[in-house]
Amino acid sequence: MGPLSAPPCTQHITWKGLLLTASLLNFWNPPTTAQVTIEAQPPKVSEGKDVLLLVHNLPQNLTGYIWYKGQIRDLYHYVTSYIVDGQIIKYGPAYSGRETVYSNASLLIQNVTQEDTGSYTLHIIKRGDGTGGVTGRFTFTLYLETPKPSISSSNFNPREATEAVILTCDPETPDASYLWWMNGQSLPMTHSLQLSETNRTLYLFGVTNYTAGPYECEIRNPVSASRSDPVTLNLLPKLPKPYITINNLNPRENKDVSTFTCEPKSENYTYIWWLNGQSLPVSPRVKRRIENRILILPSVTRNETGPYQCEIRDRYGGIRSDPVTLNVLYGPDLPRIYPSFTYYHSGQNLYLSCFADSNPPAQYSWTINGKFQLSGQKLSIPQITTKHSGLYACSVRNSATGKESSKSVTVRVSDWTLP
């Protein structure tokens, strides 16, 4: 590339320097026809290395030249400029401290970073005939050598045909394109294999033996390409969805035994039980048999209706059954009669209601002084008199549990009538 010599005089940009630059820009004419070219040496440069933007076929009789970062010629993108008369270098806002400009217009960038990639524009100002300068604009794009990529995965051990996997090609590299390979072939696009907009991320839906890999990704730019090591997903056998069998879905409270069994049976799984969405705690009331696959409730209460679920697990994960809820039969409890007051006056209306906790709902009946009055929860007598005084009893019965209960109140009616 020939010897390079840096000019002895360097300056950071000043207002006076900006005015000079602006003056030069004001006299720009259409580009020169000189075949100026720019090449990067070395053509492939890694991050942290140095690169020289070497200028070929530089015209003679130059006034100076200006380097810009990007293709926009403004102060913000101004890196450095060289003025031939006086061998003066000026620096602009885009100067990072790592750029060195030489008298042959070549630009050295040291310790290259990702931020240095992209386009660079060289403006060459040639001496004119006294009326202005002739300028040429030449653009060059710098690319870093692509790093060797690696593939990261949201899950290297997916369940067969049930789980989605996200593969990502790392690192994210500016001004580069991404390619994917499966089984050494370019990636077929199907409903189960989809790429992100940038191609950097690959989505696999319902992984099967066919789509388990191996996968490779490639990062490519105009000067280099690098491919990752192959990655193959460890496809796990699909877990069968468990289900619960039970000896009695309608147990009687504090009387019947309920036995739950988690199916299917396998020595390769562990079994977990869930009650109301929470892991079933260890309790002396609850018995577990055959490695937790069978759950026994010796005497069910109304607070243990569920829902119950069982889960089968291997070392990679698990799957739960559909919920099962018990229909616990209970009651009737001791009934309650409303309202609680028992003193009335002749001419008032008597309204009494009876309620008892029971599943299924209890049957209700009323007696007055031991004589059957009616069936139902409510009793009403309009315009009562003293002859309605007596013992009012509400009886409740649950035919499913075979239990009965009753409650009575004494009603007293005075012969004083309301005005």
Swiss-Prot record:
Cystine bridges: C169-C217, C262-C310, C354-C394
Biological processes, Gene Ontology terms: female pregnancy
SUPFAM superfamilies with a match to the protein in the record: Immunoglobulin
Keywords from the UniProt entry: Disulfide bond, Glycoprotein, Immunoglobulin domain, Repeat, Secreted, Signal
Glycosylation, residue list: N61, N104, N111, N199, N209, N268, N303
Gene Ontology cellular-component annotations: extracellular region
Designated gene of the protein: PSG7
Protein name according to UniProt: Pregnancy-specific beta-1-glycoprotein 7
Listed Pfam families: Ig_2, Ig_3, V-set
Ig-like C2-type domain segment(s): 147-234, 240-327, 335-410
Protein family per UniProt: Belongs to the immunoglobulin superfamily. CEA family.
PROSITE patterns recorded: IG_LIKE
Keyword Repeat: yes
Organism: Homo sapiens (Human)
Gene3D superfamilies referenced in this protein's UniProt entry, alphabetically: Immunoglobulins
Domain Ig-like V-type intervals: 35-144
Secretion signal span: 1-34
